């Protein structure tokens, strides 16, 4: 007859009986009693029982099997069940790292540094905005403090100094221009005896032939204007007064404001500075011509 396969219950029962027989042959209880009697100074009234023969108590310490395990015989039968292991010794401790706020912020803001053209334009916009705010604080002198960096404060002071130099040189050359125009006009007015140097509503006065000294007045006026205005242009260009004093011109302020939206406008800033310099010289010439017209009007009223 063929043997019938064993059920799971029968297999467990046979395995349990085999394990108990091996423990009986190995005298595990006697070895355990010897170990406990050697390690303890006080003997109990009852003989200790093997851990394999007694049922585990729920309040037993989990470290006791770990202390006994080195004394167990190193001989192991391949058919024995594996030793019971504490789950605390098998499972590694899971460490949860606390998030570093500074590192997270640096990663977030650092991701925008090496960006594309849009990121660079945004960086230019913010840099221009901060530069204008710092320059405005330095010129007004109302919000400047010692806690700010030295570079923006130095730039604002340099800008204010250049504006002061620009106004100072304009005032000096204005005195020279007015003195030259007045001297030239009154010299010819006093030396010419007839009415050719005066303006009059009468027809006979305008019909008179001009005196030769009238041409010398125009010659001296043109010569003085060229010499004075050329000197003004050379001095201001050499000292870079108009190139550094950007806050003194409304057009340059408009270019700076527009460069925050369209950075390409900064390429035209040197051209705008040069045109502003030319316009300053031309406005001085117009002022001298208007002064001559006013003088002729006053003379005509006097006559």
From Swiss-Prot:
Pfam families: GET2 (PF08690). It is a multi-pass membrane protein. One of its GO terms (cellular component) is Golgi membrane. The keyword Endoplasmic reticulum applies. It comes from Debaryomyces hansenii (strain ATCC 36239 / CBS 767 / BCRC 21394 / JCM 1990 / NBRC 0083 / IGC 2968). Residues 19-86 are annotated as: Disordered. One of its GO terms (biological process) is protein insertion into ER membrane. It is found in: Endoplasmic reticulum membrane; Golgi apparatus membrane. This is Golgi to ER traffic protein 2. Residues 31-48 have a biased composition (Polar residues). Belongs to the GET2 family. The keyword Ligase does not apply. Keywords: Endoplasmic reticulum, ER-Golgi transport, Golgi apparatus, Membrane, Transmembrane, Transmembrane helix, Transport. Required for the post-translational delivery of tail-anchored (TA) proteins to the endoplasmic reticulum. Together with GET1, acts as a membrane receptor for soluble GET3, which recognizes and selectively binds the transmembrane domain of TA proteins in the cytosol. The GET complex cooperates with the HDEL receptor ERD2 to mediate the ATP-dependent retrieval of resident ER proteins that contain a C-terminal H-D-E-L retention signal from the Golgi to the ER. The chain crosses the membrane at residues 169-189, 217-236, 281-301. PANTHER family: GOLGI TO ER TRAFFIC PROTEIN 2. Its main location: endoplasmic reticulum. Component of the Golgi to ER traffic (GET) complex, which is composed of GET1, GET2 and GET3. Within the complex, GET1 and GET2 form a heterotetramer which is stabilized by phosphatidylinositol binding and which binds to the GET3 homodimer. Residues 1-168, 237-280 are cytoplasmic. InterPro entries: GET2 (IPR014802), Get2/sif1 (IPR028143). Residues 190-216, 302-303 are lumenal.
